Amino acid sequence: MAPSRKFFVGGNWKMNGRKKCLGELICTLNAAKLPADTEVVCAPPSAYIDFARQKLDPKIAVAAQNCYKVTNGAFTGEISPGMIKDLGAEWVVLGHSERRHVFGESDELIGQKVAHALAEGLGVIACIGEKLDEREAGITEKVVFEQTKVIADNVKDWSKVVLAYEPVWAIGTGKTATPQQAQEVHEKLRGWLKCNVSDEVAQSTRIIYGGSVTGATCKELASQPDVDGFLVGGASLKPEFVDIINAKQ
């Protein structure tokens, strides 16, 4: 990892937790020794964004797990970047595979959300990744490059973007891409950014890995030159999240 790219660890709590157990998790995180050279972000369910922001140590940022593409309006059930910022959160996760595949979000919609979130001043954790049948068909690059292009077309300032590569076949399945598989895709993504955006953006943009990251798998993954951190699912609700945050130490 280039010295200019600060290691980034996001915890995606998904639709999990209640005040009591999330409060206990937050106490664990607040009491833990976290490295100063690692950026840590937690993404609680939207109902708990305010709770998390009030309880978490200020050095841990808060993200929403989703947002809509406009500021206000008759969009029942949606939240806007402005609302997310109003609660003190600084980031939003967009394009997560569960949004794509469970809720049917298209590349086009994700691109529109990315553009609006950035315009409103949020940082964006933009997710891309192939499904198992796509990997087995040998089209991993085609899929992730197409997804990345739609994101890139909607980004003016890359300093507020973290790219999260999550092979869909490794999310919540217990299967993890090998460190070599992760590095190979991350390296190709950086190459795509160099060719299609700029060398400066390619060198400075953090590309993080998501997909069944655990305390046991994180150190070797973190040692790969193009893996700049993690987007952690289930393990971010457990004390081992602290070990993952410390993967570079």
UniProtKB/Swiss-Prot annotation:
Active-site residue list: 166
Please name the source species.
Answer: Mesocricetus auratus (Golden hamster)
Q: Which GO terms describe its molecular function?
A: methylglyoxal synthase activity; protein homodimerization activity; triose-phosphate isomerase activity
Spell out which residues are annotated as carrying Phosphoserine: 80, 106, 159, 198, 212, 223
**Leader peptide range in chain numbering:** none
Q: In which pathway does it act?
A: Carbohydrate biosynthesis; gluconeogenesis; Carbohydrate degradation; glycolysis; D-glyceraldehyde 3-phosphate from glycerone phosphate: step 1/1
Q: Please give the residue positions where the record annotates the modification N6-succinyllysine.
A: 149, 156, 194
Post-translational modification 3'-nitrotyrosine, affected residues: 68, 209
Modified positions (N6-acetyllysine) are: 14, 156, 194, 238
Localization, per the record, is:
Cytoplasm
By its UniProt entry, which Gene3D superfamilies does this protein fall under? Aldolase class I
- Gene name of the record: TPI1
Function of this protein?
Triosephosphate isomerase is an extremely efficient metabolic enzyme that catalyzes the interconversion between dihydroxyacetone phosphate (DHAP) and D-glyceraldehyde-3-phosphate (G3P) in glycolysis and gluconeogenesis.
Keywords, in A-Z order: Acetylation, Cytoplasm, Gluconeogenesis, Glycolysis, Isomerase, Isopeptide bond, Lyase, Methylation, Nitration, Phosphoprotein, Ubl conjugation
Protein's UniProt name? Triosephosphate isomerase
Q: Which residues carry this modification: N6-methyllysine?
A: 194
What SUPFAM superfamilies does its record include? Answer: Triosephosphate isomerase (TIM)
Which positions does the record annotate as the modified residue Phosphothreonine? 173, 214
- Its chief place of residence is cytoplasm
